[in-house]
Amino acid sequence: MLKLVKMFSDGSCLGNPGSGGYGTILRYKLHEKILTSGFFLTTNNRMELMGVICGLESLKESCIVEITIDSQYVKQGITNWIATWEKKKWKTTKKKLIKNLDLWLRINAVIKNHHITWFWVKAHMGHLENERCDKIARQSAQSPSVKDFFYENNFYQNKNL
């Protein structure tokens, strides 16, 4: 029987682009784990994606995962856009590579290991875990320690895949 894990995640960016961070809470029964990291130069959307990715990648086995986020970009991307992007070789209707391709490739790979239900909550409306994740993400953004290599180097810019 698969374990039920509840995940709450949020991203933050000071400047957008600017320094950013994510805060992710994983909860299994009475156990809770907090994941966070701060990046020197990144975007809010990248931090929203990174929080979910790092949470899922930290799971050691396939699980049922309930993910609560406040990012429409991530929720719509996963539930509505990703299948089309994959079919079109990760290109937009204008034949350009999608933004944040490195992260969409990672999330696309890791979601296949789990049974996921996505929940969206409105930001800054008092949802306890979302507010905690927001605070953790902002704190990490204020003290970055990691380079967002793919963003800073425009890695997928002008590349033919």
From Swiss-Prot:
Its cofactor is Mg(2+). Gene3D superfamilies: Ribonuclease H-like superfamily/Ribonuclease H. Binds 1 Mg(2+) ion per subunit. May bind a second metal ion at a regulatory site, or after substrate binding. Its EC number is 3.1.26.4. GO terms for molecular function: magnesium ion binding; nucleic acid binding; RNA-DNA hybrid ribonuclease activity. Keywords: Cytoplasm, Endonuclease, Hydrolase, Magnesium, Metal-binding, Nuclease. It holds the Pfam family RNase_H. Residues 1-142 form the RNase H type-1 domain. GO terms for biological process: DNA replication, removal of RNA primer. Belongs to the RNase H family. Endonuclease that specifically degrades the RNA of RNA-DNA hybrids. This is Ribonuclease H. It comes from Buchnera aphidicola subsp. Schizaphis graminum (strain Sg). The lineage of its organism: Bacteria, Pseudomonadati, Pseudomonadota, Gammaproteobacteria, Enterobacterales.
